[in-house]
């Protein structure tokens, strides 16, 4: 079980996972060693699974951010999954979902032409509905 201080630590690390233990401790009113001990405990208990960065895909040349609802009418999804594994340049996440569709695919593309080619290739394995991200 976690307490209010642990919740504050998680909140601060969610905002900036690069905080030093000293700065984090100041924000939650603990010493750096006490803060580090709590962070280690959160990691050991599996509450913190890792620290990550947020990549600016536009600066890397991927100006199109899209979500695709994937619809597969066949029982076997392996051809679709095999195709997705070959598309790691464009696929950010592939979530198996319930509700509308079988999968929710998050992708990035450098141009409409590349998106169009991806959709043509995808259509050999599944039907889809595309939503383009306008803003965050």
From Swiss-Prot:
GO annotation, cellular component aspect: cytosol
Xref: PROSITE patterns: HTH_ASNC_2 (PS50956)
UniProt keywords, alphabetically: DNA-binding, Repressor, Transcription, Transcription regulation
GO function term, MF aspect, one: sequence-specific DNA binding
Keyword Transcription regulation on entry: yes
GO biological process: response to amino acid
HTH asnC-type domain sequence ranges: 2-63
A Pfam family annotated for this UniProt entry: AsnC_trans_reg
Keyword presence, Plastid: no
The entry's DNA-binding region: 21-40
Role played: Negative regulation of glyA transcription and kinB-dependent sporulation.
Protein name, entry field: HTH-type transcriptional regulator LrpA
